[in-house]
Amino acid sequence: SRYRIRLIMKSKRLQGLVTAGRWTLPAAIFICTLCWVLTSALLPELTMTAGEEGGSVLWQSARTLLLPAWAEHLVSFLIYAAIGYFLIELNNRFSIIRMRASVQTAIYFLLVTVCPEMHLLYAGNVAAITFLFSIYFLFKSYQQSQASGYLFYSFLFIGAGSILFPQLTFFSVLWLFEAHRFQSLTFRSFCGALIGWTMPYWMLFGHAFFYDQMELFYHPFKELATFGDIFNLQILQPWELATLGYLLVLFIVSAAHCVVAGFEDKIRTRAYLQFLIDVTLFLFVLIVLQPSQCSNLLPLLMISNSILIGHLFVLTNNKTSNIFFIVATVCLILLFGFNVWTLL
């Protein structure tokens, strides 16, 4: 039949072999681990640029006092591994790519690997985990008449992450808008969301008040109100500009595919994909507004972008998409070489 012929043709293309192959994720893990070790050897003195540490006083103190310098790469690697696992679970639970795919995790690992400076431990790394958990509970609230509990947990993780990375609070506004689109925002669920977001801060307030360290409580709000150099993209490093350009091109193509081919997905899936498009666009805007936080926002940007890119490559099967897949892969390799070269 015609459908069977299309499947055979797709299986012969590189794109089909990679996206449908059972060894894609193990191969990506092996390649990423190897590149991670090689970049650690090539860049043994790699440190964060001044002003890019980000995070709250609590995060900076914990990072300095509790974690030796040699363990940064290992802890960061384990955090990214956890994010990759939860990306698989997120797709399996909500069927965003219409199949039990792990290609989004392979893409996420590769995107992180080609940016050696992201191998360091940023507040954004930990915030990315809470960000992903928050998305999970927000997705579960879709068209739920009793969504208070789901929004409570979703905003609880936003609040917990914002204690370490205050800029995560900005997403609470977008989350409320998306909850309204998911038809799960009522007065009761709004109160649940508000209680969830404030709960980590009540706990922080109790600790700060008891130990007379109120600066710990005030600092996240001060950091949130400090924007730094708005629109000053000149402070971005070459590797950050190159990575953002690469991600922007893939996002535009992936988002266009979601819009054009959205009729092939269920209504619920289209809502999830639109959410991911909104979040990715929001992250790009936030990076433009606060370029000093780029390194902390990139792990979050790669989460939403990797799902959209995976959706594009898994569900397209024509010659044009295969050529684009090959070009994107070659550009990813070149990006890795460029990023390493600029840091030598």
Protein language model annotation of sequence segments:
Residues 52-67, 218-241, 256-257:
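Juxtamembrane membrane-water interface segments that cap and precede transmembrane helices
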Residues 71, 75, 114-126, 293-297, ...:
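Membrane-embedded glycan-lipid processing machinery
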Residues 78-94:
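Transmembrane-helix motifs of polytopic, lipid-linked glycan transferases
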Residues 101-116, 125-133, 154:
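Membrane-embedded helix bundles of polyisoprenyl
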Residues 134-149:
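Membrane-interface transmembrane helices that cradle and orient dolichyl/undecaprenyl
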Residues 150-166:
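Membrane-interface alpha helices of multi-pass inner-membrane proteins
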Residues 171-195:
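Perimembrane helix-loop-helix junctions
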Residues 256-317:
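Membrane-water interface signatures at transmembrane helix termini and the short loops
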